[in-house]
Amino acid sequence: MAVPKKKTSNSKRDSRRAHWNRKANLAAQRALSTGKSILTGRAKGFEYPTKDDDEDDDE
């Protein structure tokens, strides 16, 4: 069975964890920003169904 020969240093561990946290924070920030732009009506990059569109589909 494959086993690491040496223990990973604390600084390397902390660096990897910090990088992962940075990526997670960036993704969360982007999601929050997209949600805010949708709620304020400023989103122009994509379309999503509204009540007016639903009524047109029924007819």
UniProtKB/Swiss-Prot annotation:
Gene Ontology CC: large ribosomal subunit
InterPro entries xref list: Ribosomal_bL32, Ribosomal_bL32_plant/cyanobact, Ribosomal_zn-bd
Sequence segments annotated as region (Disordered): 1-59
Pfam families for this protein: Ribosomal_L32p
Swiss-Prot/TrEMBL GO biological process terms: translation
GO molecular function: structural constituent of ribosome
Composition bias type Basic residues, residue spans: 1-22
Keywords in alphabetical order: Ribonucleoprotein, Ribosomal protein
Family (UniProt): Belongs to the bacterial ribosomal protein bL32 family.
NCBIfam families in alphabetical order: rpmF_bact
PANTHER family in alphabetical order: 50S RIBOSOMAL PROTEIN L32, CHLOROPLASTIC, LARGE RIBOSOMAL SUBUNIT PROTEIN BL32C
Protein name, as recorded: Large ribosomal subunit protein bL32
Record organism: Acaryochloris marina (strain MBIC 11017)
Gene symbol of the encoding locus: rpmF
